[in-house]
Design a protein with these regions (language model features):
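Transmembrane alpha-helices and adjacent helix-loop boundaries
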Residues: 1-223
């Protein structure tokens, strides 16, 4: 028998927000580690390493994240012959997915640094790793902040895909509540509004940071 949608049902949806944010932060942290290595491999002198990074990016950017989630969830179970919980599978899948996109964002930020900065580092007789660490990466980090925050917004919304394997985040909570109340036209607009509340402030932060960095670099914006 269907039940009405009231305060308890709304609170159930709110209780799913922490798991959504935790998954997003975990995937962003894991993706940051992977993405940094990918970005560096994309610019190293070694051609095989550049090919490896390019292949990784092509694989994860060129396939649906849903398929990546399926392969991770069921692949781990088959490979290790164990029952895999949804949480580690989802976290791994989204970390690998995030790494491909963050790697390209950060590679572009590194390559945006003027060549004169590299030449100045070479004049100081710094090795390639030290050039990156002391000269290039600090400047690239500043440039990469707006697109990284923008990707974080997309990542929060993409975590809704985790509902397909039963991970209880905001979308899955909405599905469960719809199954008990039979009121999808009430539940899903509320879920959408909660996603908007989570993502809109980050979008504003990304736009503000982009304007400030463009102003610092002397780039004119056209509206």
């Amino acid at each position: 028998m269907a039940r009405s949608f009231g305060t308890a049902e709304f609170l159930f949806l709110l209780e799913a927000i922490p798991s959504t944010l935790l998954l997003s932060l975990g995937a962003l942290a894991g993706g940051a580690i992977v993405g940094l290595f990918v970005a560096i491999l994309r610019i190293v002198p070694s051609r095989p390493l550049r090919w490896l990074a390019t292949g990784y990016i092509g694989l994860f950017q060129g396939t649906p994240v849903l398929m990546q989630l399926f392969v991770t969830y069921y692949g781990l179970a088959v490979l290790f012959r164990i029952q895999v919980d949804a949480w580690p599978a989802v976290l791994l899948a989204f970390s690998l997915y995030s790494g491909a996109f963050l790697g390209e964002i950060w590679r572009g930020s590194i390559e945006a640094i003027p060549r004169a900065q590299w030449e100045a580092a070479e004049c100081l007789s710094l090795s390639f790793p030290k050039q990156l660490w002391y000269v290039i990466l600090p400047q690239a980090a500043r440039i990469s902040i707006p697109p990284t925050v923008g990707f974080a917004v997309q990542l929060i919304k993409n975590t809704s895909i985790a509902a397909i394997i039963g991970f209880v985040e905001l979308t899955r909570a909405g599905q469960l509540m719809t199954n008990t109340t039979f009121k999808p036209m009430i539940v899903y607009p509320i879920v959408a509004a909660l996603y908007f509340i989570l993502c809109w402030p980050l979008s504003l932060v990304a736009q503000t940071l982009e304007r400030r960095i463009d102003a610092a670099l002397g780039i004119k914006q056209h509206f």
